């Protein structure tokens, strides 16, 4: 069982960041978002940040963090084949031009766990997909990840 499956899911709070070992995902703008801007982002109701962390010998280590926001999928901007795919799970009486979605706005994996075989980014995306499709029955996820591909793989 990998480190991701041994970790704890939590809100990303100032107290958690202050009590944890230094967390960096290797991108200064993304690190700054998680340490500074994410709290204003949440208080303005733009999105909520979460993390997974492990506790070892009284130290906390954040292994990854992400931010989700409410979003919409505007089907009138999609090609017909994609439009049909988006609406196929919705009864025809409820089909519309706009569907609610969840936006993954920021996602970062601790540099210590990038490209180490643990596949933290993949596990995290699988968790988010499960969280919003199985638990809350939200239909679609909209992914707008603002980072380099090597960070999430």
Residue spans of the language-model regions?
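Non-catalytic substrate-recognition and accessory regions of acyl/acetyltransferase enzymes
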Residues: 1-116, 123-149
